[in-house]
């Protein structure tokens, strides 16, 4: 975000006087206590995506592959390498001051929003959510929704005046507080919890959450990027997707933070199945695999716009 006032003067979202509206406001009050209100000024693109005939098992396979390859999206489309000093006031950081200005940045950063300065917390860092299936995923979230967290217990549900501080003192107040790069989703009924909807009726679509706003696009994202995402997500769905492991989950978090903070650093290596591999090499291999899918989409829709989107990504990777 741009210049901000002091944290306590940033207003909390208000959603009316209904029970649902009040719960939304209390949830955001809780986010303010947990992460600071400045965090709620962060914006990004959420891209919802589905295909007919795809079941929960297939969506989770897609999600596992997406998480493995998300570094490519951060590298290509990350657009938050710098920020206003007010955003990190009172927080530890290793940002540098931009020459001739007041902005702070990291020289090779791609997306500070998706790094350690974004929606991250000591509490959520303890979560190692597996995406091997709906039940395991749901069990992980249920644990976070019911596990008390000492720092949040200290805040309490209500303040001395009786007003709500937060919805709960557990690690997560509600499911939406878990900030992953991608989520399995289901349209919910009025009053229904997202986790209940997923367990009862399965995954209906996925929500991609790591895309930064493109400052050069009026609506924050361009048509070419959307076409690339469609090709990328189809590749994630169609490719072999072995189960994840605790070791791989740790690797993926490492890769995300490294790419967010240092993704454009020449010679940067990521971790893949316990081995160090150059980001550029891995990224080039992945983009090469997208070509046939782009060609099939263009064959179905006419033109060559999907192939051009992949070619543009390949050019950006090498630039």
Annotated model-derived regions:
Residues 39-52, 205-212:
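Histidine-centered divalent-metal-coordination microenvironment in nucleic-acid enzymes
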Residues 4-5, 22-33, 50-198, 209, ...:
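Loop-rich catalytic cores of soluble enzymes, especially ATP-dependent carboxylate-amine ligases
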Residues 34-43, 199:
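Exposed beta-sheet edge/beta-hairpin loop segments within beta-rich domains
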Residues 210-216, 223-243:
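C-terminal, active-site-flanking charged/polar segments
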Residues 200-204:
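Core structural elements
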Residues 18, 22-26, 38-41:
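Structural preference for beta-rich elements and adjacent junctions enriched in aromatics
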Residues 1-23:
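Signature for HUH/AEP ssDNA processing cores
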Residues 157, 163, 254-319:
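Cationic, histidine-enriched alpha-helical/coil surfaces that engage anionic ligands
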């Amino acid at each position: 975000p741009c210049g901000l006032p002091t944290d306590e003067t940033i207003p909390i979202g208000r959603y009316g006087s209904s029970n649902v509206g009040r719960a939304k406001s209390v949830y955001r009050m809780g986010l303010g206590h947990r992460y600071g209100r400045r965090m709620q000024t962060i914006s990004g693109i959420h891209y919802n995506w589905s295909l007919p005939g795809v079941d929960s098992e297939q969506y989770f396979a897609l999600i596992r592959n997406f998480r493995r390859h998300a570094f490519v999206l951060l590298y290509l489309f990350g657009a938050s390498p710098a920020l206003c000093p007010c955003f990190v006031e009172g927080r530890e950081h290793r940002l540098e001051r931009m020459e001739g200005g007041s902005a702070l940045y990291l020289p090779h950063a791609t997306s500070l929003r998706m790094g350690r300065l974004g929606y991250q917390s000591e509490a959520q860092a303890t979560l190692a959510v597996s995406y091997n299936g709906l039940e395991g995923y749901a069990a992980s979230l249920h644990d976070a929704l019911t596990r008390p967290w000492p720092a949040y217990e200290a805040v309490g549900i209500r303040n001395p005046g009786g007003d709500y501080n937060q919805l709960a003192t557990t690690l997560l107040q509600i499911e939406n507080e878990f900030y992953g790069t991608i989520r399995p989703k289901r349209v919910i009924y009025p009053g229904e919890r997202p986790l209940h909807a997923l367990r009862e009726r399965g995954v209906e679509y996925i929500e991609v959450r790591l895309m930064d706003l493109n400052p050069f696009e009026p609506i924050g994202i361009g048509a070419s990027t959307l076409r690339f995402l469609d090709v990328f997500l189809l590749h994630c769905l169609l490719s072999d997707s072995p189960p994840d492991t605790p070791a791989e989950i740790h690797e993926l978090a490492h890769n995300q933070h490294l790419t967010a903070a240092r993704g454009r650093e020449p010679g940067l290596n990521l971790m893949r199945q316990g081995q160090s591999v150059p980001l550029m090499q891995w990224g080039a291999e992945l983009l090469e695999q997208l070509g046939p899918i782009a060609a099939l989409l263009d064959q179905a829709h006419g033109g060559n716009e999907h192939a051009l989107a992949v070619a543009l990504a390949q050019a950006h990777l090498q630039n």
